[in-house]
Amino acid sequence: MAIFSDFNFYNRCGVIMVEQVNFRTRQYNYNTINSVKSAVNTSYVKNLSVTPTFTASVPITSKAPQVASLKMRTTLDSKEEKNEYTTILSQLDKNGRKIVDNLLKTGVLLNSDSNDHSTVLDNLYKIATEPRAEGLDSKTMLKDTIAAIAYPYIITQQFGDIPPEYQQRVVAANNENKTNLIDIWQGSQDVNVEHSGTCVAASTEFKLAKQLPAEFARFAQELSSPKLSVNKTIGLNNLADETLNAIWLLNAFEIPFETNNFNTAKLNFAPDKNAIFRAKIQTTNKDPYERTPLDVLMQSTFMQIGSQQSYNSLTDKRAGKFNQNDKGLIEFEKTFTESVVFDKNILSVTYQTVDENARLVGYETDLGTMKKHLTTALDEGENVIIGYTQTDNNNIIVNGHEITIVGYKTDDKGKVTFICNDTDDNIPRAIEYSEDYLLPKIHHAALPKHIVEGDLNIVPNWTEGIDMYKQMKGAA
C-alpha cells in the first residue's frame, strides 16, 4: 500500500517550493500493486527538480464550455427570481453582495445543471430562508456556499481542533457503546485529528463546486437541512454495462437506493452521524485554513459513499470491506464515489506499473499518450482528479497525494504546464506543474471512458470490485 502524505512548503524568492515530503502523515492510501506488463526506464523520475509556482488569478479550466447544452442566463426573468435574489442580498455584507452580483453577471447564479434542475439561486434562497440542521447557522452556511462556488480554491481538508468546552461531549460520542478501558482511552485520543485523510473527498467537493455549481449548491442546501441528506438520480449504465452489475455495486457500497426501472436509480447520500459534531464546532470555532461546516458535511458524505458507510468524522477513520487501512479511500472506492456523485461513466486509468514490492518499474503507456488523455479531458470541460506518487532512491513508492488538474497552458515550444488544485497545502490558489515533473508521477487519473478506451485496455470499475471482493472473501 502507498501511504499518502502532505507536503511542507516554504517560500524562496517569492516562489513556493516543495522542501520535503512529510513522512509522518498518513493522509491517503490506494492499492498500487499490479502485475508488471512492460519495463520502462524510470531512473529520471527521482531526479526531477520540484519547482511548482502559483498562478496570480483563477485559471481558465478548458477551451470548451463546461455546460454546453445549457443557455447561459444573466438576467432575473421572474418576480420569484427577483425576490430570491433580493432576499439573499439582504443577508450578506457589501463584499458578499458584490460576489453574488458577479455570479449573476457570469451566468453562474442562474445555472440549472443540477440533478433536479434547480438553480444556484434557488438553493441559496432555501439556505437563507429555511431551517438548517440543529447547531448550524443559515448565514454561515449561505456565506460559505457562495464563497466555495465563487472561488473553490478555498476548499480545504484541514480538520479543526476541538475546543475544551466540546471535548467531553465529543469523546463521549466517540466512545458510545464501548466497554473496554483500552478502547475507551484510544477513543479519547483518536478525536484529536492532526492530519486529514479526506483528500479524495475534498477533491471531489472542489470538482463539484467548480464544474457543477448548481449541483454543489443543491448538495449544500440538502446536506445542511434538518434531514441531513441529499437524493440523486443516476443512470445505472454510468456504473456498469449491465443493470445487475450496477445494482451489485450499489449494494456492495451499502448505498440506500430505489429503482423504478432498469435504467435509473435514486440514491441517498448522507454524512456520518458524527459529522454534525464537527460541523457545529466549525460554525462557532473555525480558525484560518480550517474546514468550514460545509466542508465537514460534504467531505463526510463523500467519505461515507466510498467507505461503504463506515466513516467516522470524529476520528477521520473508516472500516469497510474493500480497504484494510483505516484512513482514506483506495482507488476503486474513489472511482465509485466520483461516478455516482457526477453521474458519469468514470474510469480510473492506472498509468504506473508497480511490482509486488511497490516498486515503480514502468508505465502502461507512453507519457505522450497520458498527456493527450489529460488535455483532451480538460478541453471537454472536465476537471481531472489524479493520484500521484513519490518514490525513494530505489523507485519504491513511499508517498503520494490526490489533487485535481483544472487546466493547462502550452508554451511556444509545445511544452505543457498543468494547472492544479491541492486541498491540503493551506494555499487557496492554483499551483502549476510542468509536464516533465507531473506526468511521470501520475499513478492514476479519473477520466471519461471514451477518452481512453481506444488506447488502453481498462478494467471497468464494477469488474474490479467483484474480483476484489471475491479475493477478499476467499482469503477470509
Q: Where are the language model's segments positioned?
A:
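A generic structural signal for solvent-exposed, polar alpha-helical segments
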Residues: 10, 222-225, 254, 357, ...
